[in-house]
Amino acid sequence: MWRPSDNKLYVPPPAPVSKVITTDAYVTRTNIFYHASSSRLLAVGNPYFPIKKQNKTVVPKVSGYQFRVFKVVLPDPNKFALPDTSIFDSTSQRLVWACTGLEVGRGQPLGVGISGHPLLNKYDDVENSASYAANPGQDNRVNVAMDYKQTQLCLVGCAPPLGEHWGQGKQCTGVNVQPGDCPPLELISSVIQDGDMVDTGFGAMNFAELQSNKSDVPLDICTSTCKYPDYLQMAADPYGDRLFFYLRKEQMFARHFFNRAGSVGEQIPAELYVKGSNTLSNSIYYNTPSGSLVSSEAQLFNKPYWLQKAQGHNNGICWGNHLFVTVVDTTRSTNMTVCAATTSSLSDTYKATEYKQYMRHVEEFDLQFIFQLCTIKLTAEVMSYIHTMNPTILEDWNFGLSPPPNGTLEDTYRYVQSQAITCQKPTPDKEKQDPYAGLSFWEVNLKEKFSSELDQYPLGRKFLLQTGVQSRSPIRVGRKRAASTSTATPTTRKKAKRK
């Protein structure tokens, strides 16, 4: 007896799936380049926590283990005063910027920042145990300091970067949850904002949710969320706006090995050990991280980088005239100690009560860019593709797509504000909404910082040397040669002398 196959038959989708194409297919690059640079960018604050007075932050938290996310605002090239107006037709083309080079400058000396907690949950030294400690008291917290994992990172894209961390998830229905049970974990992907903490060696997690004792990690992260860049998610972005390229260097080693005080939530199975005469000690082990040596030989910053081909489909085009540069540099994380006298008349002998100690961390940045002017021909196919990718781009260009025809008959009243008719739907707000409203970034405005004189800037001179592009307005300085009274050429005169 014949029977049909048990394999499933997969039917193709009714409409063809649109293919994502690279920006090089519809963006034409010109030979016009501009240099733009920021001013000296400085940040000063307390490295562990913000200082508040009357519920108002008077000293911000500034740590060497924070993300610095720069939102670079560029001028609209379609409203730009160009040296050559014949490069594009405003009726059928639009101009965009392409980032072709950048240099992230870092000031301040190399240094290692120390963090810690005066009440850290450290019970016993399990690396070099002098005795077997099995009965911890009610409070065994001690004062411990450490250095963190070493990280250097630079992410570049035209959209904010994404980060990942572990947070508390939701329990399934029907599960009996008791107080003290381990909560379920959930991988959360979110936008990395300026001031978010990086992974310090204790994991990318929400410590406020998953460590309720506030004593398992140092002060600067015990109530914070440490994020790690979500490279997999950004690499899978179909349009490649979040990540043109990235530079990364991480290193860490385990310096000390401790265990935690407290009740063990999950006991060791009896088949894994032979019972002894002593009570089993705590088996919740952890290590203190260390980033080891910092050296100028392994620096990612203070050097130029040229973008020839991005890893995604967006080859450096700055949609919306925005560029996001995300920086992490823990090799300059020195925490400075500031001492202030509490009285104007100090005693001859030292008294610690006459002085107040403060902690401060400072950061210094300088951003330099090379931008290339590009044109886009506004064909129907290109405009439809851009509208599918990001409709706000066409809105910024004062374009709109007509809606599809509606087969239903709509009602329109003469007197909209009349009480004799039903309440009408509110008119939608036509003001342009900031797509990044509610997110915190360090904004760098470069609208008035563009210059075509590349040879007048350090990064511009490096770009001219690397690419061989001539400056747009070279100045040739030469010495005028005096007119010769002889009619013979130099070659003729040399031959005449040899005879």
Swiss-Prot record:
Recorded GO MF terms: structural molecule activity
Keyword check for Disulfide bond: yes
InterPro entries with a match to the protein in the record: Capsid_L1_Papillomavir, Capsid_L1_sf_Papillomavir, dsDNA_vir_gr_I_capsid
Any one Pfam family match given in the protein's UniProt record, by short name: Late_protein_L1
UniProt-annotated location(s): Virion; Host nucleus
The family this protein is said to belong to: Belongs to the papillomaviridae L1 protein family.
HAMAP family membership: PPV_L1
Record protein name field: Major capsid protein L1
